[in-house]
Every structure is written in C-alpha cells, then in structure tokens.
C-alpha cells in the first residue's frame, strides 16, 4: 500500500514539473519571438535606433535617394526632421544648388546639384493648378512694362481666346526664394491674371505643398531673405487698365506660415519727373533685390517698353522699418541689366554683380566697395557662350564660400563654374582694408591666370531648356 502511494506521489510530482517546464518553454519562445520582432523593427539589426539615426545623419545627402528605397522604415527615417536636426548639430549640413529651367511649352522644371558629388537630381514637378480667369477686358489699356523676357504674345493670345501654355500653368512670371530649408515659388500669372499663391518644396519630404498666400497678387516680384524671413517687393498686378507696377512689399515668416505688410517703396526718384506726361509714360519698377549688410537693397528703373532709365535705388532696414535712398555710387554704378534685371549675389559678406559685355560673349564680375561707394572689377573676363535670346543666359550663385557662375558651354550644356580669386577684395563692410585686385583673363574659355582660376564644378545636358533662376539651400 505504501509503495502504491509513493508511486502516485512521484507521478504527480513529475506531471507538475512537466507543466512548469512547458510553461517556461512557452515564456522563452514568447520572449524570443518578441525580441525577433523588435529586431526586425529596428532600422539596422542588432543596433538601437538611436545609433542607427546617428549613422544615417552622417551619410551624404545624395545617398538619401537610395536610402528611401531600402524599406518603409528607412524612408520614414530620412523623411523626418530628426535626421536633419541632428545633421545640423553635427555640422554635417550640405549646400545644394537648385536650378529652375523652362523647357518645351514653357514647362518649368527644377534640378538639384550636389556640388561635392557633382550629381544632379530632378525634383518632382510642381503641381498643375489653374486659377479662374478674370472677365476679359479691353486691350486698349494694356501697357507692357515688364521685362523683355515677358511673353507679350502670350498675354495677347489669352485676351483673344487662344490657348497657351500659361493657361495650364500658374507659375509664369513667378518669383523664387529659399528660406528655412525650403524652396518657394511665389505668385505669377495664370491666364493673364496675377495670383497670390505660394508653393513650397520640402527637400526632406521631397514634395510640394501650398502655404499661405500673399496679401497681394503679384507677378515678376523680387525676393530676399533677412532674419529667416522671406521678403517680397514690387512686381506687377493686373488692374482695370492692364498691368500696373507695384510699390508694395510684404514679408513671410515660415515659422508661423503668415504674411505681414512692409512699408511700400517710395520710389522717390519717380516723384521728381519734370512733367505729368513723363510721369505717366515712365513707370517705376524694381529691377533686382539683394540682402546686404542686414538690409534689402533694391535697384530701380523707370520703364517704358523697350527703354529703361536707371534711377538708383532704395534700401529697407528691418530694424527701423523704413526705406531710404540707396547710396549714389551703389545705385548708379550697379552693373548693367540682364533682361531688365540686375544680377547680383552676396558671398561671405561681399556684394558681387555681373556686368555683361555688349558683345554678349563675355562679361565682368564687379564687387561693391562700401567705404568708397563704388563698384570695382574683380574678374575681368567671364566666359559666356549662350548667345540665344533666352530669359537668363547666365546666373550667379554663392555656396561653399565661393562665387559661382552658371551658363552654357560651347556644347550647349548647362555648366556650373567656380571662380577662385586668391586676392579677393575686402570692402569696409567686413574689414578695414580696401585693397583691390583686378585680374584679367586672356580668353573666353574657362582658364587660369595669375589671379583667377575657373574650375568646372558640374555640367548637364538640359536639352533646349532655358535657365530661369537658381537658389541655394543648406540642410
């Protein structure tokens, strides 16, 4: 009897142990399964995501297009601000050049250049949005006051009821700006009507989105950035009598997605014309805008197609919220127009401008000397090969602390050249020295002399597309 009881107890004990072992095994399998799932959900297996993000932030931006193809998690990781904020903390931001071109049927296309890898990327196309056209009005009041690049025939065709590419694209006559890591396309014409819409390209998301519209509709305006805010001045609007110039200005704050008014440009020189006839004939317009020494510098002209009369310019100080007349040497000496505009850029605090030659085969680069209130030549000959009647046969840009010139080469490829000038002049805006080196190139081709070296950064075949504008974004 005792042996039977002992055997029964042993069986119960064994059964209990088996149950416990089975339970422990299930727990281990569950934990292992959870660990496997956690491992699979990580960006990089065997590494915590915090470390993986550190690795991704150190990759060159040009690699991100491939990173997005790895998995949804990787695509999500490089499409958030976390990686880019970390890049900024690590000092790993990169300056890219964004070039706007106009192709077949006036279609606008954007391309981004990584100047380090010299690789180009095409941006997603801008949204196709058609805005309602105002009721048609008489052509008798229409006067052509905008630049020669403005397609007068397109406006006439739109009034006559003929279809034109601008009817399908509201970005004809748009202004371009870049602030806070975003690329902005501002205003323009849609079916001959000026619009106030603003579109933003986000390089992080690689997509376009519409942001708050301007306070006023305008086309062919000028833009500049001060204190992380985007300023828009001038341009034209369509009133009862046709297209009329604007003196108004406004500013966009990307942190609040809101526009605010800025005092209008006085155009003081236009107020002193000798008689009413000239005042009605010559229309004041802003022919450019550059942010220099913390202020907006706006060269101006009086315009009556096809003539321009330069009248200096005005300067806006955001601290005083006032416009003042531009120094005479700065305004009167601002180098010649390019299709009704004045081409300039600020690099390391120095204001440069391109002065095209009358032969259209070369030109000069000048720098503004604030102390002497004059423009001085720093590059005596700049290669220009695009002899076509395009809107912008050449562009200026500043990145990596250097001046860059964008034009077409003899094979009609878009070419980005860097000007290396050892003895770069320094104006009183950044140093007490006022010494100036005046180099001179002997040929039109990218060449090297004792004082300047033209270095080819990148080239690309855009076909028959014309250059329109360019911006630099650092993220």
From Swiss-Prot:
UniProt-listed InterPro entries: F-box-like_dom_sf, F-box_dom, Kelch-typ_b-propeller, Kelch_1
Residue segments, region Disordered: 1-28
Pfam families cross-referenced by the UniProt entry: F-box (PF00646), Kelch_FKB95 (PF25210)
Kelch repeats: from-to residues: 94-140, 182-228, 229-279, 306-350, 352-401
Keywords: Kelch repeat, Repeat
PROSITE patterns for the chain: FBOX (PS50181)
Residue ranges occupied by any F-box domain in the UniProt entry: 41-87
PANTHER family in the record: KELCH REPEAT SUPERFAMILY PROTEIN, OS02G0202900 PROTEIN
Protein name: F-box/kelch-repeat protein At1g22040
Organism listed in the record: Arabidopsis thaliana (Mouse-ear cress)
């Amino acid at each position: 009897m005792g042996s039977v009881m002992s055997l029964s107890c042993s069986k119960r004990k064994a059964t209990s142990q088996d149950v416990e072992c089975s339970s422990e095994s299930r727990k281990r399998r569950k934990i292992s399964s959870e660990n496997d799932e956690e491992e699979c959900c990580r960006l990089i297996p065997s590494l915590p995501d915090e470390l993986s993000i550190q690795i991704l932030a150190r990759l060159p931006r040009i690699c991100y297009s491939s990173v997005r193809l790895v998995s949804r998690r990787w695509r999500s990781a490089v499409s958030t601000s976390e990686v880019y904020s970390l890049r900024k903390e690590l000092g790993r931001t990169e300056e890219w050049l964004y070039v706007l071109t106009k192709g077949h049927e006036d279609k606008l296309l954007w391309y981004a250049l990584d100047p380090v890898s010299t690789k180009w990327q095409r941006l997603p196309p801008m949204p196709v949005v058609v805005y309602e056209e105002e009721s048609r009005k008489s052509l008798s009041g229409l006067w052509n006051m905008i630049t020669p690049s403005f397609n007068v025939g397109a406006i006439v065709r739109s009034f006559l009821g003929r279809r034109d590419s601008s009817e399908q694209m509201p970005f004809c006559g748009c202004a371009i700006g870049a602030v806070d890591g975003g690329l902005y396309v501002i205003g323009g014409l849609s079916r001959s009507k000026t619009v106030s819409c603003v579109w933003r390209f986000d390089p992080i998301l690689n997509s376009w989105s519409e942001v708050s519209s301007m306070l006023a509709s305008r086309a062919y305006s000028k833009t500049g950035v001060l204190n992380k805010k985007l300023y828009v001045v001038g341009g034209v609007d369509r009133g009862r009598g046709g297209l009329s110039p604007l003196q108004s200005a406004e500013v966009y704050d990307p942190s609040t997605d809101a526009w605010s008014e800025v005092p209008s440009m006085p155009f003081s020189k236009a107020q002193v014309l000798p008689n009413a006839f000239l005042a009605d004939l010559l229309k004041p317009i802003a022919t450019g805008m550059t942010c220099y020494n913390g202020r907006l510098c706006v060269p101006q002209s009086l315009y009556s197609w096809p003539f321009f009369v330069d009248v200096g310019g005005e300067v806006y100080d955001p601290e005083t919220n006032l416009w003042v007349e531009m120094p005479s040497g700065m305004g009167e000496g601002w180098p010649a127009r390019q299709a009704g505009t004045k081409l300039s850029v600020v690099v390391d605090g120095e204001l440069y401008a391109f002065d095209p030659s009358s032969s259209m085969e070369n030109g000069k680069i000048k720098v503004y000397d604030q102390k002497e209130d004059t423009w001085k030549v720093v590059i005596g000959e700049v290669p220009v090969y695009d002899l076509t009647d395009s809107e912008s046969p050449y562009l200026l840009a500043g990145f990596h602390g250097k001046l860059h010139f964008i034009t077409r080469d003899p094979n009609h490829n878009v070419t980005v050249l860097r000007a290396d000038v050892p003895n770069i002049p320094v104006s009183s805006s950044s140093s007490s020295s006022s010494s100036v080196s005046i180099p001179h190139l002997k040929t039109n081709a990218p060449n090297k002399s004792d004082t300047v070296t033209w270095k080819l950064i990148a080239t690309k075949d855009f076909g028959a597309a014309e250059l329109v504008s360019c911006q630099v974004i650092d993220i």
